[in-house]
């Protein structure tokens, strides 16, 4: 009988032929059952022809899958962008003499210099944290591969001992074997480091962030409307403040003429 992809098979109906063999590594999969050939009375569905493999993820892979699944559907209300690799991390601090003269003669320049150096320090911290996390991740991968190789070697040694009729008691120290696994704790610390790095960001829209925090979960169209109203209000206030001075200046100029 023909096996169509995705069909359900009912062995209580129809005529069935003899079991058929499938090529190596090919299985008939019907629901939660799998056969290395086509049986005379398969049950279940949907049925497919495919290959089977063993899934044995470690703690690192499981945490990556959970992290990717938890990030879906997350809404960001604040317009805070994270620092990228293109930011400048060249920190050049002023000496005491330059700070004193700048504070006395040009306070605005001193404040701008301080803000710029703070931004560069934040960029330097983010890059260092990213490098540290990447380095520790590579070391964890190496340790995981070494652990896997050690377990394979131990299994081969046990097999050879049993094949020659010996046990672990014949060789000192072979009966006790403890290989600790701290990958789960290390992965948690990696996640904490990434969370701390993500706390450093640049607020590209402070007015919008302030309005979102003031009015709660309002829509973006309302944010743009409120920003337009605030801009119009600021322009009106500037006109109210500056227009009398401008009119007075024009009138005094005309009188002198």
Curated annotation (Swiss-Prot):
Q: Where is the lipid attached (S-palmitoyl cysteine)?
A: 245
Q: Which residues lie on this side of the membrane: Extracellular?
A: 1-229
| GO cellular component terms, A-Z | host cell plasma membrane; membrane; viral envelope; virion membrane
Mind telling me which residue stretches traverse the membrane in this protein?
230-250
Q: Provide the residue span(s) of the region labelled Fusion peptide.
A: 95-115
What residue ranges lie in the Cytoplasmic compartment? 251-257
- Keywords (A to Z) from UniProt: Cleavage on pair of basic residues, Coiled coil, Disulfide bond, Fusion of virus membrane with host cell membrane, Fusion of virus membrane with host membrane, Glycoprotein, Host cell membrane, Host membrane, Host-virus interaction, Lipoprotein, Membrane, Palmitate, Transmembrane, Transmembrane helix, Viral attachment to host cell, Viral envelope protein, Viral penetration into host cytoplasm, Virion, Virus entry into host cell
The disulfides recorded in the entry are none
Query: Site annotation (Cleavage): which residues?
Result: 78-79
One Gene Ontology biological process: virion attachment to host cell
Question: Where is carbohydrate linked to this protein?
Answer: 15, 58, 68, 130, 178
Q: Which domain of life is it from?
A: Viruses
| The UniProt record lists the keyword Disulfide bond | yes
Segments carrying the region annotation (Immunosuppression) are 151-167
One Pfam family, please name it.
TLV_coat
* Coiled-coil blocks: 112-162, 180-210
Q: What does the record say about PTM?
A: Specific enzymatic cleavages in vivo yield mature proteins. Envelope glycoproteins are synthesized as an inactive precursor that is N-glycosylated and processed likely by host cell furin or by a furin-like protease in the Golgi to yield the mature SU and TM proteins. The cleavage site between SU and TM requires the minimal sequence [KR]-X-[KR]-R. The transmembrane protein is palmitoylated.
Q: What is said about its interaction partners and assembly?
A: The mature envelope protein (Env) consists of a trimer of SU-TM heterodimers attached by noncovalent interactions or by a labile interchain disulfide bond.
Other remarks in the entry:
This protein is synthesized as a Env-Ryk chimeric protein and then cellular protease cleaves this precursor into gp85 and the putative oncogene termed gp69 (gp37-Ryk). The sequence shown here corresponds to the Env (gp85-gp37) homolog fragment of the chimera.
Q: How does the entry describe the domains?
A: The 17 amino acids long immunosuppressive region is present in many retroviral envelope proteins. Synthetic peptides derived from this relatively conserved sequence inhibit immune function in vitro and in vivo.
* Cited function: The surface protein (SU) attaches the virus to the host cell by binding to its receptor. This interaction triggers the refolding of the transmembrane protein (TM) and is thought to activate its fusogenic potential by unmasking its fusion peptide. Fusion occurs at the host cell plasma membrane.
- The identity of this protein, by name, is Envelope glycoprotein
Q: Which organism is it from?
A: Avian retrovirus RPL30
Tell me the name of the encoding gene.
Answer: env
């Amino acid at each position: 009988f023909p096996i169509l992809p995705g069909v359900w098979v009912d062995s209580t109906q129809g005529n069935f032929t003899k079991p058929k063999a499938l090529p190596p590594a090919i299985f008939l999969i019907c629901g939660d059952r799998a056969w290395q050939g086509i049986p005379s009375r398969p049950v279940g569905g949907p049925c497919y022809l495919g290959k089977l493999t063993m899934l044995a993820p470690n703690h690192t892979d499981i945490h990556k899958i959970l992290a990717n699944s938890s990030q879906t559907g997350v809404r960001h209300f604040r317009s805070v962008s994270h620092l990228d690799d293109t930011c400048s991390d060249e920190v050049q601090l002023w000496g005491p003499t330059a700070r004193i003269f700048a504070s006395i003669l040009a306070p605005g320049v001193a404040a701008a210099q301080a803000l710029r150096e703070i931004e560069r320090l934040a960029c330097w911290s983010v890059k260092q944290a990213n490098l540290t996390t990447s380095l520790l991740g590579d070391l964890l991968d190496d340790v995981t591969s070494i652990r896997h190789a050690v377990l394979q070697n131990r299994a081969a040694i046990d097999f050879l001992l049993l094949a020659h009729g010996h046990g672990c008691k014949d060789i000192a120290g072979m009966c006790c074997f403890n290989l600790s696994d701290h990958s789960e704790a290390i992965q948690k610390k990696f996640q904490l480091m990434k969370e701390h790095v993500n706390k450093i960001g640049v607020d590209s829209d402070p007015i919008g962030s302030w309005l979102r925090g003031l009015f709660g979960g309002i829509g973006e169209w309302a944010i743009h409307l409120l920003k337009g109203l605030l801009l119009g209000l600021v322009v009106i206030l500037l006109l109210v403040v500056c227009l009398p001075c401008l009119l007075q200046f024009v009138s005094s100029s005309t009188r002198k003429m």
